Amino acid sequence: MQVIKDGETLRIGPLEVTAHLTPGHTAGGTSWSWKSCEEARCLHIAYVDSLTPVSSDTFLFTRNATYPNVLKDFEQSFATVSALPCDILLTPHPEASDLWSRLERREHGDPNALVDAAACRHLADAARERLLKRVVKESSEQGSAAKGT
């Protein structure tokens, strides 16, 4: 067994993958990036671990004793993912990267349907927006509870 740290590269045969710590959805979230070449064309591929602020109703992102750095971790992960070289984005939940519609477009003749150099940034921006909505909801619920309403 080998522990891979943030920014370290792991070689698997001819493939070199780089680890990127992306905690938030889980404290140990890790994303990976690598370059893949076919003939003269090389693309940067990123597998981005879940950035979704989904949890049970009892888990509070704004005040959580078991994971007090969750909001800070999410922001760090959003910045990391936004900065990744990312021609092709892969996610644990295919709908997060619009994989199904991209594959359909590819089947209908678009050879570059999977390629989007802004995909990682878009994913991070969308996840940040969902987290902000959750934080606003928690804050308004806390305010209502404090007022006794």
Give the location of each predicted region.
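Residue(s) in the substrate-gating loop at a strand-loop-helix junction
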Residues: 6
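C-terminal regulatory/interaction regions
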Residues: 111-149
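Metallo-beta-lactamase
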Residues: 1, 9-11, 16-118, 122
